[in-house]
Amino acid sequence: MAAILLPQRFRGEAPVTEKTTPSWASKRLTPIAQFLSRLACSHPIHTVVVVAVLASTSYVGLLQESLFNTDVESATLGKADWSTLVEGSRVLRAGPETAWNWKAVEQDVVADAGSDADHLALLTLVFPDSLSAESSSTAPRSHHVPIPQNLSITSLPSTENPFTAYSQDSILAYALPYSEGPEFLAAAQEIPNEDAVEIETKHGREKKTWIMKAAKVNTRNSVVQWVSNAWSEFLDLLKNAETLDIVIMLLGYIAMHLTFVSLFLSMRKMGSKFWLGICTLFSSVFAFLFGLVVTTKLGVPISVILLSEGLPFLVVTIGFEKNIVLTRAVMSHAIEHRRIQAQNSKSGKRSPERSTQNMIQYAVQAAIKEKGFEIIRDYAIEIVILVIGAASGVQGGLQQFCFLAAWTLFFDFILLFTFYTAILSIKLEINRIKRHVDMRMALEDDGVSRRVAENVAKGDDELNRVRGDAPLFGRKSSSIPKFKVLMILGFIFVNIVNICSIPFRNPSSMSTIRTWASSLGGVIAPLSVDPFKVASNGLDAILATAKSNNRPTLVTVLTPIKYELEYPSIHYALGSAASNPAYNDAFHHHFQGYGVGGRMVGGILKSLEDPVLSKWIVIALALSVALNGYLFNVARWGIKDPNVPEHNIDRNELARAQQFNDTGSATLPLGEYVPPTPMRTQPSTPAITDDEAEGLHMTKARPANLPNRSNEELEKLLSEKRVREMTDEEVISLSMRGKIPGYALEKTLGDFTRAVKIRRSIIARNKATTDITHSLDRSKLPYENYNWERVFGACCENVIGYMPLPVGVAGPLVIDGQSYFIPMATTEGVLVASASRGCKAINSGGGAITVLTADGMTRGPCVAFETLERAGAAKLWLDSEAGQDMMKKAFNSTSRFARLQSMKTALAGTNLYIRFKTTTGDAMGMNMISKGVEHALSVMANDGGFDDMQIISVSGNYCTDKKAAALNWIDGRGKGVVAEAIIPGEVVRSVLKSDVDSLVELNVAKNLIGSAMAGSVGGFNAHAANIVAAIFLATGQDPAQVVESANCITIMKNLNGALQISVSMPSLEVGTLGGGTILEPQGAMLDILGVRGSHPTNPGDNARRLARIIGAAVLAGELSLCSALAAGHLVRAHMQHNRSAAPSRSTTPAPPMTPVSLAMTSAQERSASTTSMSAAAIQRSKR
């Protein structure tokens, strides 16, 4: 119970528990967070803009009103006056009551001290860099300091600190009555320098003197000067700080930066390399600004020193765990929503909860429902602890810092569920556009036309989008840069407006704020000094004098006074030039003639003189440049692999699925009634081409019963691009007369289905083939109710219909711990049933294990040279490191996905064959790699010094594509996969109706020896091509590549009484993007395997997963067929499943003969029949 009160970051990883009923507090608080996030997600851009405007106004207000006041009153702070020095002083008392030891007392005790104690002021004058050997100046001696005759001043021994050796400062210390301090300070603002040389300046002849730094006039606050002052103040802090404090602060800042690094690493794991981490920091900074504004408005004093000391520990303690937890939950639910939406779209079902919410809304709401209460609870616990600290009464800045931190956490809570959830919404929408663009570009790289690629990508968007889910930016990649440019310009505009409005704000209205600012405890007030570090030797001398006089003494140790060696005419003044009325009059008079615009320009120029304002503007411009650079490089993201199973395999579910797909079961087991699945609405047909957008309002075709127009009228309509108004017969007439090319019917008509119908009639009436094609237009080859839009320009030309092919599913098959149904398109009976039997046996042994051994598509061009010498030089260059680098660079520049792995060269006379091997993402990649090869060869000829090279063919059969070749068997092509399963002996006997030894012997005799006798290349298997071809047809792969993809060797072993079977396929050529996979039926089959399209995080993973699935399916097919051969069931199974009658016995009288079959007797039967063997055979068997 106590652990629940700790914030999540201190509780570690919570154990996985079952879902519990939400508590009362969760039911009350979670809806509040969901309401805030719902508003932010509904209007993310508005939310980001409003928060950015408020944050910009807040920090500009803080800069003007608190930190960098330029009016007369604030100009006096930090100047050479006594009151400013006293603010950072410390008072010590020594006397008999303190046993003559120094004891710190409060300022209010000084007034009550009375006349029984001497009150002294101890001043320390610091002359920087005067001890350095390279310095041309030396510090003044104590008697050179101008001291009025009426003052009683005592010189004291100076005190060095640990940093004196680094800073090379000279120090003078003085003690004088406290009442005489202001007069001495006024007299010591300028100290002569005896070593200075008098020179001529524009103010006359003068020489450098030591000028009190606090009395110096800054005529121009340059950035360099600001940095120099900041460094000097930092060194002063180090001089007055304890060593332990320095170490603690250093560790605190290191830990804070490690927290930042941890934030970016965590966001990187969730797919955001930079921007989610930056937005998290922005959210926290905005919360800090809002908290600082509220804290200062309530009159709580906050100093810069306090912030610098406390912020690192606040960042380390609170961290960014809440943002990380929320981000992880949102991204995970977004992927879950996409997967479930895809499943519902395929089945026609719709989740009632998700039907009214788009993906972004659902992901955010589900994440807050899951993690919202934990986040709110952590915020509440942390705020309560800080409130206790603010009310504790502990001095030293703890109260003020806790007060500020509590308000910061409160605003961080508000911004987490508003600003940050809006950022997450925008991120999810950018990811959607990225998926759309990546899929389109991958299809274009694979040779698909832009129109078809855009339609396929758009279809994928629609699959994952519910009705009414409008895109935030649109579907164009250019929408993202436009949005970001507008956001950046808007943010810069707000800052410019805020800065420009500063000169127009009424100074008198700030008087109350000035009064409040003076009570701020000194946002710019000096830090209290450590008296013993500043003047320990001087205190010892004063204490010795007090003891000798036996008189109590009060000593006020003032802040060290720093000097600079400068010309008096430039740096010494009675007042600040910024506060000088003459200066202001001259400044405003210069712009007075320009009216309001002049005052605005003057205000801007004056504001830009402030080093911090100019620094913020430079940072804003740098961020703008960085953001614009990011517009064209949105990082990929990913939370979890969709191919990873979400739960362990349920044996009962697996058994029921196997029984449903088992051919031995004639009926289904009775159970609960399941309503029929409604059909998903198909895309409307006809579809319209992109260049015929006006076809959405197509004119109806002319009724067929009207008389045909004349040829002149038809040709006029054709020239006016009004072909769609013609009847089918008129279009046929024009086409048969050669006026409309057959390939252009779809584009001309703007109606794909009508174009296919007319083409059928044209082919049926073609005189050259009419004798055999006359029935085509009335044939049973279907052509209607098909989405021809995806076929046109991508898959097939001169379309006359589509060929329905039966598709069955084998399985389920457990592959690498996940169950799959294997889709197979085939007309061969028993094939699916046989594969299902193999799946059942493999599942009984724990499933199949697969290993991916290679991934690289190849293309082997042929180039020729005039002489063998040149051909050999080209081969040596290609094999060298320089040649490899140049060719890789050229090849990789042609695609975002194709990456050249290696090149293998072979020389045949003067012909040089180069085998390029590359990865191609999730596409099979033949077109992608061909484009890369062309460009690489061009670079080789032009830049590699082989301009005499002649390209014979981009494909020189050295690939080798769609042909049996030993090269593919040895070096591989596409994906290399090895699948293995171990089948218990009992399963072999009960399911496969055979035994382990018989299967092993059959495999050796048939698949190994038999294939070797036939001189096979890669054909050491029973029927791998059967399974590969069926899956290829079902999933939209290239059927011609079955030739090399079916290369397989099947190996079986007896492993401790169990059957160990494996298949090795070194040249499996598959893809999940492009080609036939863009067709909806084939895409649906990839959907049931979970590998459709490109992988969201790792391009190529889907294609590799499909290769593993095919390898495991081939394993099941090999196991089942070999078992049927070993048991003699092959012919009987074909006869049963093909519904063919068994052959009758011949009526010819003949002795009964053993039928010729493929059955094999078992080893035991063969050993039992040795009595019938000849003596020679028996003798050979004993050897």
Curated annotation (Swiss-Prot):
Reaction equation(s) it catalyzes: (R)-mevalonate + 2 NADP(+) + CoA = (3S)-3-hydroxy-3-methylglutaryl-CoA + 2 NADPH + 2 H(+)
Lumenal topological domain: 267-273, 321-378, 424-482
InterPro entries: HMG-CoA_N_dom, HMG_CoA_Rdtase, HMG_CoA_Rdtase_cat_sf, HMG_CoA_Rdtase_CS, HMG_CoA_Rdtase_eu_arc, HMG_CoA_Rdtase_N, HMG_CoA_Rdtase_NAD(P)-bd_sf, HMG_CoA_Rdtase_sub-bd_dom_sf
Positions of transmembrane segments: 246-266, 274-294, 300-320, 379-399, 403-423, 483-503
Gene Ontology, cellular component aspect: endoplasmic reticulum membrane; peroxisomal membrane
Domain SSD: 245-426
Protein topology in the membrane: Multi-pass membrane protein
CDD domains according to UniProt: HMG-CoA_reductase_classI
EC number(s) on file: 1.1.1.34
Region (Disordered): 1136-1183
Pathway(s) per entry: Metabolic intermediate biosynthesis; (R)-mevalonate biosynthesis; (R)-mevalonate from acetyl-CoA: step 3/3
Residues the record lists as binding NADP(+): S895, R896, F897, D922, A923, M924, G925, M926, N927, M928, I929, S930, N1138, R1139
Cysteines engaged in disulfide bonds, as pairs: none
An annotated GO BP: coenzyme A metabolic process
Family label: Belongs to the HMG-CoA reductase family.
Entry function: HMG-CoA reductase; part of the first module of ergosterol biosynthesis pathway that includes the early steps of the pathway, conserved across all eukaryotes, and which results in the formation of mevalonate from acetyl-coenzyme A (acetyl-CoA). In this module, the cytosolic acetyl-CoA acetyltransferase catalyzes the formation of acetoacetyl-CoA. The hydroxymethylglutaryl-CoA synthase then condenses acetyl-CoA with acetoacetyl-CoA to form HMG-CoA. The rate-limiting step of the early module is the reduction to mevalonate by the 3-hydroxy-3-methylglutaryl-coenzyme A (HMG-CoA) reductase HMGR.
Protein name: 3-hydroxy-3-methylglutaryl-coenzyme A reductase
Organism: Gibberella fujikuroi (strain CBS 195.34 / IMI 58289 / NRRL A-6831)
